[in-house]
């Protein structure tokens, strides 16, 4: 287990999670921000990428497990993403549709932000969200993030407008404020 919250725990994805992951990544409505559901090969590539991220970075998108049932209901975690001319640490989340609107994404995303600031000593974290994904934008806002940019992301042959959300570590902000007053 990587992170535990009141109702959830987050752990590394494993090959045995492929069926649960497919419920998320092969659902058309869940994946509309990605221009449609993934096929079996894309799901396997997604899983392999996360396992590679754990080995390379020590983190990635983690399986979100509902404590009450021990069921994998989504994924949430931290990944490096390219934005403009820099690489940023992103909090990402995707949940099975039947678990939407229960606060699980917000609960997991807040825990990932705390993990980034306290365990990884990150100075800031971002969320990159499709302009049409109002629910994910609300999760970012509830996670203390502020929209700070807009850009076009090219994916699956489509130009997709996205918003960039950002949160700054309080510790980093205090250090910056202190240095300004000296």
Question: What annotation goes with each model-predicted range?
Answer:
Residues 101-115, 138-142:
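Conserved acetyl-CoA-binding loop-helix of GNAT-fold acetyltransferases
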Residues 171-178:
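Conserved small/polar residues in nucleotide/adenosyl-binding loops
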Residues 15, 36-37, 41-90, 168-170:
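Acetyl-CoA-dependent GNAT
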Residues 65-67, 92-101, 130:
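A short, internal acetyl-CoA/4′-phosphopantetheine-binding micro-motif in the GNAT/acyltransferase core
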Residues 127-137:
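Conserved beta-strand-loop-alpha-helix junction that forms the acyl-donor binding cleft
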Residues 120-128:
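Conserved GNAT acetyl-CoA-binding A-motif
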Residues 1-48:
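A short, well-structured alpha-helix characteristic of acyl/acetyltransferase catalytic modules
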Residues 128, 146-162:
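Conserved catalytic-core motifs of GNAT/GCN5-like acyltransferases
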């Amino acid at each position: 287990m990587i992170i535990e919250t009141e109702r959830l725990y987050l752990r590394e994805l494993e090959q045995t999670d492929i069926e649960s992951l497919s419920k998320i990544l092969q659902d058309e409505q869940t994946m509309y921000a990605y221009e449609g559901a993934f096929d079996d090969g894309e799901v396997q590539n997604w899983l392999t990428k996360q396992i590679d991220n754990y080995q390379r970075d020590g983190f990635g998108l983690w399986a979100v497990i509902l404590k009450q049932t021990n069921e994998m209901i989504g994924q949430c975690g931290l990944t490096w993403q390219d934005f403009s001319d820099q690489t940023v640490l992103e909090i990402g989340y995707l949940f099975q549709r039947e678990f939407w609107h229960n606060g699980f994404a917000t609960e997991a995303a807040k825990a990932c932000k705390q993990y980034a600031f306290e365990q990884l000593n990150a100075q800031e974290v971002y969320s990159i969200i499709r302009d049409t994904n109002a629910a994910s934008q609300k999760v970012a806002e509830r996670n203390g993030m502020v929209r700070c940019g807009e850009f076009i992301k090219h994916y699956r042959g489509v130009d997709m407008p996205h918003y960039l959300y950002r949160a700054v570590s309080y510790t980093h902000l205090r250090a910056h404020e202190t240095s300004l007053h000296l």
